[in-house]
């Protein structure tokens, strides 16, 4: 249980807590985002994505967001994205590279997975932090993400998974999630 500020009713508090908590853990706790850095948020118009855009902007980051329609791109801008890219109309990775003058992004909050994760590696800055925060592209797509060790090593890139649902890995089975045993 958490204390709720008086300005929130219970429904608003519940709707606020999850997306902003996930965004905070992804960007700040795991991603180490600092003021002045550039962050890429995939799925910037969704619940966690829009929270990540707002949080990153509030922390003083330059924010690039991707979304899948003109209306969603505009929504990302209204949430504070400095640059919003419609991933369905072209090569979003080229647009990110241009926007960063080929330097890349310091932190990426990947809420999509799969091929998006693979392409995100193209736009990571040296020493960047790639946060695998969701899989709106489908959980099966996660297994198709081409994370090449050479790219990670030579780019000095950190890759981390972010999952808030269960703090204790031993509790996964109790929640109906069955992990593949490690051999």
Identify what each model region corresponds to.
Residues 33, 100, 124-125:
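A generic alpha-to-beta junction signature in SAM-dependent methyltransferases
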Residues 35-37, 105, 156:
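Phosphate-coordination loops involved in phosphoryl transfer and adenosine-cofactor binding
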Residues 2, 40, 64, 129-131, ...:
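Structural detector of well-ordered beta-strand residues that form the stable sheet scaffold
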